[in-house]
Structure formats: C-alpha cells, structure tokens
Amino acid sequence: MALTHEQKLEHQSKFAAATNAGQPDITMSMCVEGALVWHNFDDKSVPYASTGKTLTRMHQAIPNLRWETRAVAATSSGWMWQAAIRGTAPGGEICAHSVMIVTLNDEGLITQLDEYIDPSQLSALRG
C-alpha cells in the first residue's frame, strides 16, 4: 500500500535527525539493500552504503556540522529536503546548499536518493 504524505514526512524527519547526529547506521536501516545515491556534480550513482563513511568523516572533521532545513515536501514517490550544510571546517566556515530527492518503496525504505550540491562549497573541509 502506498505511503501517506504524513508517513513520508515522518521518514524525512527521522532521516534528517540521523544525518544531523552523524548516525549512518540509522540512515542505512532506512534503505533497501542496494539503494543508490546519484550526484548531480558527476552524474554518477554510488551505493548508499558508501555515503555512511562520508557522513562519519564529515562529522569527525566538523564537530558542529548540521543541516539547516530550508524546505521539506512530500512527493508522489517520497520526499524532498532542501538544506544548508553548515559548520566550522578545518579551512573555515562552510555553507553548502543541498537538495535531496528521495524515492521510497511501499514499505517506506529508500530505493534512490538524488543529491544536488556544489562540492566547491565544501572546499573548507580540506583545510
């Protein structure tokens, strides 16, 4: 049975909380095995499992890392999250604008995450 908009928004809220807390184990549990993340900047899809390592590294490098929500919306197939990624990185303050468009299956698990971000806005991560 298809998810309601309320269920989709609850899913997004849990995902955002786990992302902000640096808990990739929780975000992974919200995905089907083999879920993919597509990046706009290189037009490539990677296994969602590899993004957990990136999330962990980012939280280690930026103790005050956070995703400040600008907009959230349920879509016909999942949800959309627009956020500003902020924090104090080794090379200074970061403010990277991000949009994630997530596709959920009928069980409420992520099958696809499309991420739109300009990686140059994260250059301060490299110190």
What are these regions (language model features)?
Residues 2-3, 53-127:
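A beta-strand edge to alpha-helix "cap/lid" segment located at domain peripheries
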Residues 24-76:
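A solvent-exposed, acidic/Ser-Thr-rich amphipathic alpha-helical stretch
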Residues 1-33, 127:
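Short, low-complexity N-terminal intrinsically disordered segments enriched in polar/charged residues
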Residues 13, 39, 111-114:
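Short non-domain terminal segments
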Residues 7, 11, 50, 94:
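Soluble or luminal CAZymes and related metallo-dependent hydrolases
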Residues 11-21, 45, 61-65, 119:
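Phosphate-binding glycine-rich loops and adjacent basic patches that engage nucleotide phosphates
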Residues 15-18, 38, 86-87:
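Alpha-helix C-capping/helix-to-loop hinge sites
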